[in-house]
Curated annotation (Swiss-Prot):
A divalent metal cation binds at D219, H221, H253. This is Bifunctional enzyme IspD/IspF. The record marks R140, K192 as: Positions MEP for the nucleophilic attack. The gene is ispDF. It catalyses: 2-C-methyl-D-erythritol 4-phosphate + CTP + H(+) = 4-CDP-2-C-methyl-D-erythritol + diphosphate; 4-CDP-2-C-methyl-D-erythritol 2-phosphate = 2-C-methyl-D-erythritol 2,4-cyclic diphosphate + CMP. InterPro entries: IspD, IspD/F, IspD/TarI, MECDP_synthase, MECDP_synthase_CS, MECDP_synthase_sf, Nucleotide-diphossugar_trans. Keywords: Isoprene biosynthesis, Lyase, Metal-binding, Multifunctional enzyme, Nucleotidyltransferase, Transferase. It comes from Sulfurovum sp. (strain NBC37-1). The lineage of its organism: Bacteria, Pseudomonadati, Campylobacterota, Epsilonproteobacteria, Campylobacterales. Residues 1-212 are annotated as: 2-C-methyl-D-erythritol 4-phosphate cytidylyltransferase. HAMAP family: IspDF, IspF. GO terms for biological process: isopentenyl diphosphate biosynthetic process, methylerythritol 4-phosphate pathway; terpenoid biosynthetic process.
Amino acid sequence: MPDITLILLGAGNSTRFESDVKKQWLYSGEIPLWLHVAESFEAMGAFAKIVIVSSPEDIGLMKHFADYTYVQGGETRQASLKNALEDVTTEYVLVSDIARCCVPAAMIHRILDAREEASCIVPVLPVTDTLYLAQTPLDREQVRIIQTPQLSVTKTLKQALQTDQLFTDDSSAVASMGKKVHFVEGSHEAHKLTTISDLKKLPCIEAPSGKTLTGFGLDIHPFEEGKAMVLCGVKIAVDYGFKAHSDGDVAIHALIDALLGAAGMGDIGELYPDTDQSYAGANSTRLLSDTVRKIRTHGYTIGNVDMTILAQAPRLLPYKEKMKHSIASLLEIRPHLVNIKATTAEKLGFVGRKEGVTVHAVANLTYYNWKQK
């Protein structure tokens, strides 16, 4: 049985990355960066458990990709690490950052082979530039660049973090207890992804796949007297609306499901449940804007959408162009990429009896192409 747990930290909000897409969700081929990193480590060593630390929103989606252990991050890297360590029972723990995405196998093996040398095994690089501290030159032979992953004795690392003092890495925490830290050779390949320009320094990351991802959405709402009718964010001049927990914009609801389906993010009921009173009477355009944000930050680009509205009443032809531009604006795409069709049910069924409306929606997504940026 392996005696090492792997912890990969990725709960940061990518502020310095300066992109709409979280760096954890940039795609390499057909998998997001965090999964590329996890699978790379998994292929290089036998671990008792792999723990991914991330935000609650991301964890919900990550679970669709792989069966790892997921832990909610904290306000700081140290808080995130403490959360991850709570259920670690192996003798050793290997901690790295998802942003450290091109760690070579030889570097991992050097770290693991040295496990009995000290309480913490740390990969380092020499400094080749001249260094000053304020106005005083430093002896660069005494300075090292510290990298991750770092291997620690689990019990020691847990004890070291039981303090209010903040540490920038595991070795600093272990060293603060007077425990021995052992250096091994690091690697220039293990460059950390901090800004978008760093992507050029990461040869192990492939360009995203050019595959198109398609999702389908369907929603149905009955009419209700005395409510305002809104379709695609456009008010329709009739004296009835839709019976619903929110404003009942059946077209936007179908579109949200299509977008979520293409991204593999579940459905509208999971993200915006009708049991949550905060969505009572909610403006559906707000829900769509939030869905678009989720889609973009998780590595997707919206291509085109196609919607079919089945309605015996009201007559929608006068509103189609306005609805098209409303959806294009909400999706932040060009109007020609939005197609809206309206048809009757030939007086058949509940739609034909003018009891409600059904909407079908199809949405196409592609992976965000960071290679072209």
